[in-house]
Amino acid sequence: MKLSIIIIATSLVIAVVASPSKDSKAIENDKTEQRMEIVVQETARACSKQIGDKCKRNCECCGKTVVCGTIYVGGKEVNQCMDKTSDNAILNRLGKGMNFIENTFSFCV
């Protein structure tokens, strides 16, 4: 009898300690809301630059497979419109396909 009371009491204590309180759950939801944010990377703009011109966004570059890519000149980062991704013809064709998909989801005007 005493053993069963001890087991029941221990089970209740474990259940109370293990269950999260309402306050901690509310705080956790608040933290989740703070972490959720929408980041818009591209703004709707018409293209105005050709391959080789300096750019800041994909929307500035004209062409279905042209994206604003990063190259390094003299150790400095330069962004320019480009469509070539590799010297290998097969990899370059795959890269152009990826550029096309990236431009599709950029929502440029």
Curated annotation (Swiss-Prot):
<feature type="disulfide bond">
    <location>
        <begin position="47"/>
        <end position="62"/>
    </location>
</feature>
<feature type="signal peptide">
    <location>
        <begin position="1"/>
        <end position="18"/>
    </location>
</feature>
<comment type="similarity">
    <text>Belongs to the neurotoxin 25 family. F7 subfamily.</text>
</comment>
<keyword id="KW-0872">Ion channel impairing toxin</keyword>
<dbReference type="GO" id="GO:0090729">
    <property type="term" value="F:toxin activity"/>
</dbReference>
<feature type="disulfide bond">
    <location>
        <begin position="61"/>
        <end position="81"/>
    </location>
</feature>
<keyword id="KW-1015">Disulfide bond</keyword>
<keyword id="KW-0800">Toxin</keyword>
<protein>
    <recommendedName>
        <fullName>Hainantoxin-XVIII-6</fullName>
    </recommendedName>
</protein>
<feature type="disulfide bond">
    <location>
        <begin position="55"/>
        <end position="68"/>
    </location>
</feature>
<dbReference type="GO" id="GO:0005576">
    <property type="term" value="C:extracellular region"/>
</dbReference>
<dbReference type="GO" id="GO:0099106">
    <property type="term" value="F:ion channel regulator activity"/>
</dbReference>
<comment type="function">
    <text>Putative ion channel inhibitor.</text>
</comment>
<keyword id="KW-0960">Knottin</keyword>
<keyword id="KW-0964">Secreted</keyword>
<feature type="disulfide bond">
    <location>
        <begin position="59"/>
        <end position="108"/>
    </location>
</feature>
<feature type="propeptide">
    <location>
        <begin position="19"/>
        <end position="46"/>
    </location>
</feature>
<keyword id="KW-0732">Signal</keyword>
